[in-house]
Design a protein with these regions (language model features):
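Beta-rich strand-turn-strand
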Residues: 49-83
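Residue-level recognition of specific faces of alpha-helices
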Residues: 3, 27-29, 45, 86, ...
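The conserved catalytic core of RNA pseudouridine synthases
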Residues: 38-48
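OB-fold and OB-like beta-barrel modules that bind single-stranded nucleic acids
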Residues: 5-12, 30, 62-73, 91-94
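Short beta-turn/strand-loop junction motif enriched in small, turn-promoting residues
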Residues: 12-16, 33-35, 53, 73-77
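Short aromatic-glycine-enriched beta-strand elements
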Residues: 17-32, 85-86
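C-terminal structural segments of small proteins and small subunits
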Residues: 75-100
Length: 116
């Protein structure tokens, strides 16, 4: 079973790009507080697809609190002769837990289209 739920704050603004004529992907970095005396946070990349990607771009900005439900995906690539690996959350749902960015409209919850 590959299921993840996380709550945190956006550590970056949302960036959206078209990956084909029919699909868009939004990416942002989620800062998730560590439950320890030392504190700190883990910074996890999040990918959101299609209609929800557009909603995230419209309503979210750095610093806002969100809840994310989705799955983990690992990626590997070569960079300067070295093998690199990254793990990201592919979101099925993003819940906006703090108000929308200024001028964006009412707080809303969006379900992601099953893409990615």
């Amino acid at each position: 079973m590959n299921v993840v739920t996380a709550i945190g704050n956006l550590a970056s603004d949302v960036s959206v790009r078209e990956v084909s004529d029919e699909h868009k992907v939004a990416n942002f970095l989620l800062a998730i507080d560590r439950p320890s005396k030392d504190g700190g946070a883990d910074f996890v990349p999040v990918s959101v697809w299609d209609k929800q990607a557009e909603s995230c771009e419209r309503f979210l900005s750095k610093g806002q609190r969100v809840g994310v439900d989705g799955r983990l995906r690992s990626r590997s690539w070569e960079e300067e002769g070295k093998r690199r690996t990254a793990i990201e959350i592919v979101a099925n749902r993003v819940e906006f837990l703090s108000g929308p960015r200024e001028g964006a409209g009412a707080e809303e919850v969006f379900e992601a289209a099953a893409a990615g």
